[in-house]
Amino acid sequence: MKDIQKERDFRNMPIDKVGIKNLKYPIRVLDRKNGCQQTVGTINMYVDLPHESKGTHMSRFVEMLHILQPEISPKTFSVILDQMKKDLDAASAHMEVTFPYFIEKAAPVSGTPGFMEYTCKLMGTSRADGRVDLVSEVVVPISSVCPCSKEISDGGAHNQRGEVRLAIRSKKFVWIEDLIQLVEAAASCELYSVLKRVDEKWVTEKGYQNPKFVEDIVRDVAVALKNDTNITWFNISVENFESIHNHSAYATITCGRINP
């Protein structure tokens, strides 16, 4: 059977990335408490394509993923990227895996358990010279109370949910749980999936006693990361979904060196 993709292309235009996008696939990720967690990844897989090649082999991406049945971690990412380059005869390979990650959290006073969902992402690139660049990302929902509102009001203060997006490069493996805890510690208060009345009282009072602007939250996360010698680069963005405005408050910090 004729294979059109193996024919030569004469437009003299190499392609930076070509492959598959938004593939939903079952994956396993490392779980600090339970060892492993089954979840569903949304996966993008790309390779480069030289100017003389007409097309890549799209089916091989999924075949490879199914054969490997991967546990998704920084260590296995490098293996998958190398396999992509080998199977698709490519100089470089790139993969992104986004997945929901669940942590069981007890309510702060009653101890009632419930699962919190966090969106996580691993991104990796294997370059032509063999160097591998890996980025880990978590999105952590938080609560914040406005310091200005508390200061000027006779009673109460406006508060809202927010979202902290944290991406890092590191020398060694970092647990997802550690990144989440670092972010939650910088918020006015962390979120819980289940709150009884005694818990709701505790959460409300903790947030009120710990008011923070987006500027405070992003700086507190940045300081904690700068004090960790394992972290070589980070990007933090904080967005508060303002309860008294029809817009969000936003702040971001990037720090560190990206290897060329």
UniProtKB/Swiss-Prot annotation:
Biological processes annotated in GO? tetrahydrofolate biosynthetic process
Q: Does the keyword Cell cycle apply?
A: no
The protein's annotated catalytic reaction(s) are: GTP + H2O = 7,8-dihydroneopterin 3'-triphosphate + formate + H(+)
Instruction: Note whether Hydrolase occurs among the keywords.
Output: yes
Q: Kindly list the residues the record flags as site (May be catalytically important).
A: C146
EC numbers on record:
3.5.4.16
Q: In which pathway does it act?
A: Cofactor biosynthesis; 7,8-dihydroneopterin triphosphate biosynthesis; 7,8-dihydroneopterin triphosphate from GTP: step 1/1
Record keywords, A-Z: Hydrolase
The top EC class, named as a word, is hydrolase
Superkingdom of the organism of origin: Bacteria
The protein's GO terms of the molecular function aspect are: GTP cyclohydrolase I activity
Per the entry, what this protein does is:
Converts GTP to 7,8-dihydroneopterin triphosphate.
HAMAP family named among the record's database cross-references: GTP_cyclohydrol_B
Family assignment from sequence similarity: Belongs to the GTP cyclohydrolase IV family.
Q: What is the protein name given in its UniProt record?
A: GTP cyclohydrolase FolE2
